[in-house]
Structures are given as structure tokens and as C-alpha cells.
């Protein structure tokens, strides 16, 4: 049995800027600002400098799910580029992590990337 890939951490602004290849397994984070139950979609927002970045997430595989608007979430899933709406993460896991230290998570992602580069691995 083939297990899915564990998912590379990408920062939300990298996902929204189109820096993640189509079909990639990824992990990212953001504050849940909108949950559309009818379309099974969540919008996660993240602040980077003075800019707000959105990540759209399809929640069909993780429903039923209790959305807590304003709370911090981490999503694990596959990225699908769509012609009309940009990119959508098809969530396999969507976890509320309210209270997590975001600057520390961002630092850990940067440190992990640096470590993998030094070892000759990919991002």
C-alpha cells in the first residue's frame, strides 16, 4: 500500500503567490476567516508584513468539521491549480492549532529548509 507523501511546509504567501507546483503535497497555516459549508470551502488568511494572503481549502475529505472562525489552522493536503480561482488545497487534515506560536513555526520552517539544503535535499 502506498502512503501519501508527508507534505512540505510552505508559507501561506508562497502558496498564494503560486510558488508551489501543482499536485504537490503541502502543509500550510492561516486563520480561518470564512467557511462555506455548501461548497465545502474554507478561506485561511495570513499576515506577512503589511499584506494579507489567502489560501483556499477544499474540506470535502475532512467533513463534518467544526469551524472556529478566527482560529489558527494547519492544513495538510494536495494543491490543485484551477483556471478560474487560482489554487485550492484539497485537505486531508485540517487541525485547529489556536495558541500556537506563529513566529516560532515560521522560524522552524526556515531552519528545516536550511538543514535540508545543507544536506543536499529538496525544499
Swiss-Prot record:
One cellular component term from this protein's GO annotations in UniProt: CST complex
Presence of keyword DNA-binding: yes
Gene Ontology molecular function: single-stranded DNA binding; telomerase inhibitor activity; telomeric DNA binding
Statement: the UniProt record of this protein carries the keyword DNA-binding: yes
Coiled coil: none
Main location: nucleus
Gene3D superfamilies linked: Nucleic acid-binding proteins
Subunit composition and interactions: Component of the CST complex, composed of TEN1/C17orf106, CTC1/C17orf68 and STN1; in the complex interacts directly with STN1.
Family: Belongs to the TEN1 family.
Protein name stated in the entry: CST complex subunit TEN1
Amino acid at each position: 500500500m502506498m502512503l501519501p507523501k508527508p507534505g512540505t511546509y510552505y508559507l501561506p504567501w508562497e502558496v498564494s503567490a503560486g510558488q508551489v507546483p501543482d499536485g504537490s503535497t503541502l502543509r500550510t497555516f492561516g486563520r480561518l476567516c470564512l467557511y462555506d459549508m455548501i461548497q465545502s470551502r474554507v478561506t485561511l488568511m495570513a499576515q506577512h508584513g503589511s499584506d494579507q494572503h489567502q489560501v483556499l481549502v477544499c474540506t470535502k475529505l475532512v467533513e463534518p468539521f467544526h469551524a472556529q472562525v478566527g482560529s489558527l489552522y494547519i492544513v495538510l493536503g494536495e494543491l490543485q491549480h484551477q483556471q478560474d480561482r487560482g489554487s485550492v488545497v484539497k485537505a486531508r487534515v485540517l487541525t485547529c492549532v489556536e495558541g500556537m506560536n506563529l513566529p516560532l513555526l515560521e522560524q522552524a520552517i526556515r531552519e528545516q529548509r536550511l538543514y535540508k539544503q545543507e544536506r543536499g535535499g529538496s525544499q
